[in-house]
């Protein structure tokens, strides 16, 4: 139950598995916490790096040097599972994806997520450490609950069924 935190049913809830794009729940949580703490604003402009533009997988095909608002980046992460935007936001907030991943793991510990270890901000499994990128259903519930209870404004992005960015231009 999201309000009380009571588990209503569980089966292998602590089995650590690769979370793939569910990783972006934590990425969005840290972005929303940065917005709420006024470290960044939804209207701030983020510039995509070469690293972000080269992420692959689900993406909106950012070009290196392309700029977009935090709001549009969040929309792209929530709606399109955009790895390029997740990486650009990580770099914008923490200076590097690696530093952002350290913050993700720290936040996971603070939330009591005992079955979780992140190695990137996207969930992509294309690097050497991908086997170490794990979480459990229980831990996903913990971070999702935190996001739902403390960052209800994110719903404006997660409830979109169709929208455009870049004036409807793709890539």
Identify the function of each model-found stretch.
Residues 5, 18-46, 140:
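Active-site SXXK
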Residues 21, 37-61, 158-169:
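Short, glycine/proline-biased beta-turn/loop segments that scaffold the active-site neighborhood
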Residues 54-87, 171:
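Conserved catalytic neighborhood of penicillin-recognizing serine enzymes
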Residues 96-171:
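Penicillin-recognizing serine hydrolase domain
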Residues 6, 29, 33, 71-75, ...:
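Solvent-exposed, polar/charged alpha-helical surfaces in well-ordered, non-transmembrane soluble domains
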